[in-house]
């Protein structure tokens, strides 16, 4: 993509209302633009990051055996009255009345819709286990939206719903999602920690939140320092056996971990999984015939990842004083190609050759006129993993510079060598 033909409205100065670094850089790097409190337009660069995050999530969910669907964002209030949750969300839920005077709502979550989706179709244990997921926009009318996409009112979420015939099978589904989440977040370059947490308005008796450690996090986490030693193994049983809890269930009096072994950190929540048994299937009459011929309530779980929130969380984890330092897996473009002399034919010819030879959908080519300082500052701000710089030696010695954005390391290489490196890697 040529920058001269791209829409990338960056800001030089830090917006006064943006308090945390991810909010500041999201606005300055042209990822988002606010149109109302807690509501944002996703600009082209930010949308590419969202799509890359979605792609990783979709790939790992599909590998787990989950099946993608898409449920409506507008839901009938009757389903929520049936489950008994309609009044639980209070003013957080955006309620709508249509022209037929039917009560509707903009979904803050989809447990009721998911239960309704299968209750008239899935009737036998032979059809289970089943896990359906979607990537869908949701709305919660937060009292104080803040921190940009970290706590917006409209947000993109991956939510999945598992259906099982009994507790043992449901726990297997839960553990599978725990492991899948670890894989998802690690592929994004993150180091996740899964902590036991309160089930809140979703309900149930088993819940884990997934966090990344960050000083700007709103949650306080208590965990055994052995947790991260076991993370590489991705062994769910071992990870779940380690003491790691959110502050809402931590009790200093009963904590089994010695004080010197207990870590206390701030964290940003990026995912949440729940097992809630028949909380929804019972009132909504979602039953199957079990192997013994008896009708039983379906055991359910739900599993959420804040897709749009992850953009902010990743920036919190990957940035420096010049801008974002995207992990390659989620970066909007892999390479930023910078021509320092756009008015000189020899430089333009070399830059165009590099651009046409590389995979153009992975390259943002700065072919604009402007000062060298402005070009470098913009590329550092948007944080593409690699920069290819066409400077003086490109013409005289057939040499260009390759800069690693995260480390700042710069190497001089032959042009063909650089092209081969990025086309093979």
UniProtKB/Swiss-Prot annotation:
It comes from the Bacteria. Keywords: Aminoacyl-tRNA synthetase, ATP-binding, Cytoplasm, Ligase, Nucleotide-binding, Protein biosynthesis. PROSITE patterns: AA_TRNA_LIGASE_II. GO terms for molecular function: ATP binding; proline-tRNA ligase activity. The keyword Nucleotide-binding applies. It catalyses: tRNA(Pro) + L-proline + ATP = L-prolyl-tRNA(Pro) + AMP + diphosphate. Its EC number is 6.1.1.15. One of its GO terms (biological process) is prolyl-tRNA aminoacylation. SUPFAM superfamilies: Class II aaRS ABD-related, Class II aaRS and biotin synthetases. One of its GO terms (cellular component) is cytosol. It is found in: Cytoplasm. Homodimer. Catalyzes the attachment of proline to tRNA(Pro) in a two-step reaction: proline is first activated by ATP to form Pro-AMP and then transferred to the acceptor end of tRNA(Pro). Belongs to the class-II aminoacyl-tRNA synthetase family. ProS type 2 subfamily. PANTHER family: MITOCHONDRIAL RIBOSOME PROTEIN L39/PROLYL-TRNA LIGASE FAMILY MEMBER, PROLINE--TRNA LIGASE. This is Proline--tRNA ligase.
